[in-house]
UniProtKB/Swiss-Prot annotation:
GO terms for biological process: nonfunctional rRNA decay; nuclear-transcribed mRNA catabolic process, no-go decay; nuclear-transcribed mRNA catabolic process, non-stop decay; ribosome disassembly; RNA surveillance. Keywords: Cytoplasm, Endonuclease, Hydrolase, Metal-binding, Nuclease. Signal peptide: none annotated. The N-terminal domain has the RNA-binding Sm fold. It harbors the endoribonuclease activity. This is Protein pelota homolog. InterPro entries: eFR1_2_sf (IPR042226), eRF1_1_Pelota (IPR005140), eRF1_3 (IPR005142), Pelota/DOM34_N (IPR038069), Pelota_arc (IPR023521), Ribosomal_eL30-like_sf (IPR029064), Transl-rel_pelota (IPR004405). SUPFAM superfamilies: Dom34/Pelota N-terminal domain-like (SSF159065), L30e-like (SSF55315), Translational machinery components (SSF53137). Its EC number is 3.1.-.-. Pfam families: eRF1_1 (PF03463), eRF1_3 (PF03465). One of its GO terms (molecular function) is endonuclease activity. NCBIfam families: pelota (TIGR00111). Belongs to the eukaryotic release factor 1 family. Pelota subfamily. It comes from Methanosphaerula palustris (strain ATCC BAA-1556 / DSM 19958 / E1-9c).
Length: 340
């Protein structure tokens, strides 16, 4: 993403944003909220004097409008963000309009920008030059390919074939060929992950049959398979080392710490009331929040108060397993400095 800060005073102002990928559109879904004023170019029917005589001939023309946001919907698989609200600037003031924001679509957002908002903008900008990392989670007879988005792993495809130990050699080789074929279209790094020896066998197959892919890949040992293997890879910090974006790795690590402390009845609390109390007493060292809640006024106040009390705030993606686990705990938790 590219960003151009127009003017911000005491946290309020305008930032022009240029999303370049579906990751950037996802970031936008957390940077635009009801009540914000959003400007973008769109198409609307603009009537001329001639059109009024023949209204059915009114043509749609590109116009720049500003809407007061009422609803924001992220459509992951169409790479689109739908932003609906009342027009405050431009033709047909007072009418409803929906902006369909896509990659390479400039938008200006006027709002109060919190510290976490600015950090999200910085993350999107800093990640714009990174190539997409893919993880092939492989086990005997099945391989799953995942594309690592900034909000978590996105499954691309699953390949299944009878390649167990009792299967013929050509069957296993056929499975490897099937698993390697989609990798030919990938330009970024590929991580081959899984338990046992099959990942190493597949890596040797790539080196012999597809050396260009092998040169752009690395092997990582995991205990789990499928999506679980991907989470292990991220938790080990491998993605961060390759792509330079450490956020997903932090999410895995912090949620592992939350669950560890819960199991040990350690310095941990969760739930709005409990976390709010910990923050007010200065006991919260790190506050962990689901991205589903960051626009909730009560939670936003807790995040601001936590930062004032020198606690760090970490926002977890609800599209990723650690964020799903946090949501099951009420969407907010805090690692404590001392017991309450």
């Amino acid at each position: 993403m590219k960003a151009d800060v127009q003017e911000i005073r005491q946290g309020y102002g305008e930032i022009r944003l240029f999303p370049e990928s579906v990751d950037d559109i996802w970031h936008l879904s957390h940077l635009i909220a009801p009540g914000d004023l959003v400007f973008a170019q769109t198409f609307r029917s603009v009537e001329t004097a001639t059109d009024k005589l023949r209204p059915e001939k009114a043509e749609k023309r590109p116009v720049r409008i500003g809407i007061r946001v009422e609803k924001v919907e992220f459509h992951q698989y169409s790479s689109r963000l739908r932003v609906t609200g009342l027009i405050e600037s431009g033709p047909d003031v007072g009418s409803y309009h929906t902006l369909n924001l896509e990659p390479n679509f400039e938008v200006s957002v006027i709002r109060f920008w919190s510290k976490s908002d600015r950090e999200r903008v910085d993350r999107a900008v800093n990640s714009s030059g990174s190539g997409l990392v893919h993880v092939l989670a492989i086990e005997e007879g099945e391989a799953e390919l995942f594309r690592i988005r900034q909000y978590g792993p996105e499954q691309v495809l699953t390949i299944t074939m009878g390649s167990g130990k009792g299967a013929p050699v050509d069957s296993r080789e056929g499975f490897f060929i099937e698993a390697a074929t989609p990798l030919l279209q990938i330009t970024g790094p590929v991580i081959i992950a899984g338990p046992g020896f099959i990942k190493d066998d597949f890596a040797r197959f790539l080196k012999n049959r597809y050396p260009a892919i092998a040169a752009n890949s690395m092997v990582v040992e995991t205990r789990r398979i499928g999506r679980g293997a991907v989470q292990e890879v991220i938790g080990q910090g491998v993605i961060g080392k390759i792509a330079g974006d450490l956020q997903l790795g932090r999410e895995v690590q912090v949620m592992d710490e939350v669950l560890k402390r819960i199991a040990m009845e350690g310095l941990i609390t969760y739930g709005r009331a409990e976390v709010g109390q910990a923050i007010s007493f200065g006991a919260a060292d790190q506050v962990i929040v689901s991205d589903r809640l960051i626009r909730d006024p009560e939670v936003a106040r807790l995040m601001e108060q936590a930062e004032q009390m020198n606690a760090t705030v970490t926002v977890l993606s609800s599209c990723f397993e650690p964020g799903e686990r946090l949501w099951a705990l009420g969407g907010i938790a805090a690692l404590l400095r001392y017991a309450l």
